[in-house]
């Protein structure tokens, strides 16, 4: 039967060492004993990370040699909390995209159109993070572009061809690989038409960008300058066919929920008029009723929406979801800060009510999960400033009062822990 030795256990004359990293039992939290060997908790965690990475790389393939939607969503679940429907739509879309490419190479008679995706959801609900996570688990070139930096060709700003250049760079200038890649265009709501009425001035960063994106999203041979920047006649271009590139667009679309709610209202006047109560539903609930016509009213041109046939809406995050985001994912914020404190040989502990108060603050700020890090930084700033110069601190405890700003974090010193241990003995 294996025995487990704590980091404080054992006689000083018989110090035990990890058989893998060589650290002594006093340098680690736990040392697990087996037949003639020992392994520490740090090596166990390292082994678990290696196994997870191997499982990720050896995802079960379907008959077409493409990762199955179930396997894609399984990996997404490790990093992204909630948003089940959006994750399902993304995993199916990515699976179908590459199945379509495999099918096209086998049969030239039937041509399957690609289904680009539009992600709609409030700020901080995970749109960008979903796309970033997809990039890590899908072995194809991937790039992210910010729609706010794009302008119509001939004006100051980035050309839409620069998006393809970034994809080409992520593929190490392998044109064949780049032509099977994924492009995520963020902040696409910021290129909406500035006005419903035609104007005598050109809208070079709004409707003009939408028009410029149409061809590369549908499929065209783009001439990409290998060094980037503006084109000039003496420059050689790389030809990239965008027909098989999957485009995912995302945006917060602030105010879109009001357009959707107004569509369902019936206006009437007079004594018999129906008085409709104010829509008290959360933004995410209203967005479930999204129709393409709502995006047209918001300011996207019909041709642009037509290139994005798959609409996926994301929920705004409630208190419980934010608490899960803080503590549960593989790279959760709490785990990141605990790792930072471990570098100072200090254990960082959060009370449950402290996590709940952090989530409440993020909801009040209306920044979703994006606001969690700034709240954590503010809470831990003084502690991280003082800790490197303090001696003997073994644990820092964060309570609800600390999050509210009415108390300071509790510092627990090593000598007090020893006193408690002696008293209990």
Curated annotation (Swiss-Prot):
<dbReference type="GO" id="GO:0005524">
    <property type="term" value="F:ATP binding"/>
</dbReference>
<feature type="binding site">
    <location>
        <position position="43"/>
    </location>
    <ligand>
        <name>Zn(2+)</name>
    </ligand>
</feature>
<feature type="binding site">
    <location>
        <begin position="122"/>
        <end position="129"/>
    </location>
    <ligand>
        <name>ATP</name>
    </ligand>
</feature>
<dbReference type="GO" id="GO:0009376">
    <property type="term" value="C:HslUV protease complex"/>
</dbReference>
<dbReference type="Pfam" id="PF10431">
    <property type="entry name" value="ClpB_D2-small"/>
</dbReference>
<dbReference type="InterPro" id="IPR004487">
    <property type="entry name" value="Clp_protease_ATP-bd_su_ClpX"/>
</dbReference>
<dbReference type="Pfam" id="PF07724">
    <property type="entry name" value="AAA_2"/>
</dbReference>
<keyword id="KW-0067">ATP-binding</keyword>
<dbReference type="InterPro" id="IPR003959">
    <property type="entry name" value="ATPase_AAA_core"/>
</dbReference>
<keyword id="KW-0143">Chaperone</keyword>
<comment type="subunit">
    <text>Component of the ClpX-ClpP complex. Forms a hexameric ring that, in the presence of ATP, binds to fourteen ClpP subunits assembled into a disk-like structure with a central cavity, resembling the structure of eukaryotic proteasomes.</text>
</comment>
<comment type="function">
    <text>ATP-dependent specificity component of the Clp protease. It directs the protease to specific substrates. Can perform chaperone functions in the absence of ClpP.</text>
</comment>
<dbReference type="Pfam" id="PF06689">
    <property type="entry name" value="zf-C4_ClpX"/>
</dbReference>
<feature type="binding site">
    <location>
        <position position="21"/>
    </location>
    <ligand>
        <name>Zn(2+)</name>
    </ligand>
</feature>
<dbReference type="GO" id="GO:0046983">
    <property type="term" value="F:protein dimerization activity"/>
</dbReference>
<dbReference type="GO" id="GO:0051301">
    <property type="term" value="P:cell division"/>
</dbReference>
<dbReference type="GO" id="GO:0016887">
    <property type="term" value="F:ATP hydrolysis activity"/>
</dbReference>
<dbReference type="InterPro" id="IPR010603">
    <property type="entry name" value="Znf_CppX_C4"/>
</dbReference>
<comment type="similarity">
    <text>Belongs to the ClpX chaperone family.</text>
</comment>
<dbReference type="InterPro" id="IPR038366">
    <property type="entry name" value="Znf_CppX_C4_sf"/>
</dbReference>
<dbReference type="InterPro" id="IPR019489">
    <property type="entry name" value="Clp_ATPase_C"/>
</dbReference>
<dbReference type="InterPro" id="IPR046425">
    <property type="entry name" value="ClpX_bact"/>
</dbReference>
<keyword id="KW-0547">Nucleotide-binding</keyword>
<dbReference type="GO" id="GO:0051082">
    <property type="term" value="F:unfolded protein binding"/>
</dbReference>
<dbReference type="GO" id="GO:0008270">
    <property type="term" value="F:zinc ion binding"/>
</dbReference>
<keyword id="KW-0479">Metal-binding</keyword>
<keyword id="KW-0862">Zinc</keyword>
<dbReference type="GO" id="GO:0140662">
    <property type="term" value="F:ATP-dependent protein folding chaperone"/>
</dbReference>
<feature type="domain" description="ClpX-type ZB">
    <location>
        <begin position="6"/>
        <end position="59"/>
    </location>
</feature>
<dbReference type="InterPro" id="IPR050052">
    <property type="entry name" value="ATP-dep_Clp_protease_ClpX"/>
</dbReference>
<feature type="binding site">
    <location>
        <position position="18"/>
    </location>
    <ligand>
        <name>Zn(2+)</name>
    </ligand>
</feature>
<dbReference type="InterPro" id="IPR003593">
    <property type="entry name" value="AAA+_ATPase"/>
</dbReference>
<protein>
    <recommendedName>
        <fullName>ATP-dependent Clp protease ATP-binding subunit ClpX</fullName>
    </recommendedName>
</protein>
<dbReference type="InterPro" id="IPR027417">
    <property type="entry name" value="P-loop_NTPase"/>
</dbReference>
<dbReference type="GO" id="GO:0051603">
    <property type="term" value="P:proteolysis involved in protein catabolic process"/>
</dbReference>
<feature type="binding site">
    <location>
        <position position="40"/>
    </location>
    <ligand>
        <name>Zn(2+)</name>
    </ligand>
</feature>
